[in-house]
């Protein structure tokens, strides 16, 4: 048998063996939550390496009462499922209009603008055991209530297993051998991130230009999110738990309900001044959320 055929046959046999072993390893996890956690960990190991890109990281404390009052009023008017996270998403969409440099990704070594303004949300689909993104396009014009409706529609499909894209991605990730995961994610970086095209069930640029994660249900006040390379989102924001804090106002110490926002920005796209302008626009809208509709 010619050498090339032997190498090709050996490669196919090796790949088949690795896939079979991966399937057998997955089968040992009888608990669906354990299987999901194993897949997520495998993807995480293949996604990140030692950091090589510049990141800007900052935090800001926001008064919660204006947002909470707005949410309470809108829910009383019929805005089902509206939460502060959706208000934050609408504010982030408007802030992208103020700082258009943040609504870009790096492609072929240069910044390229997105065709739309999209914000992604991390949502819990496994009672704390699994997360998935829901991308909302048009976040710069949608009201918080409209964003809430779209997010909950996505959450329902993900939790019910009726989202075909996520199901396909999970199946592929479960079967791909660990050694092949990094090359697969490299391809995802090109197709999903740079070109913005769908791949293996994922939509292009699946996290949007800004990705938001509400860590409050975990009882966490602040955390800086780790950027996902293949998503190529420019800004990541975490929203911490709402707590009463002692604040000096007009020379007196008062108790104020507040939460912390932590921002991680891609320094290739935004600098310190632009992050400050973005945060200023964001916080201004959170202080007066009625401007969001």
Model-derived segments and spans:
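C-terminal catalytic/motor cores of large multi-domain enzyme assemblies
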Residues: 2-293
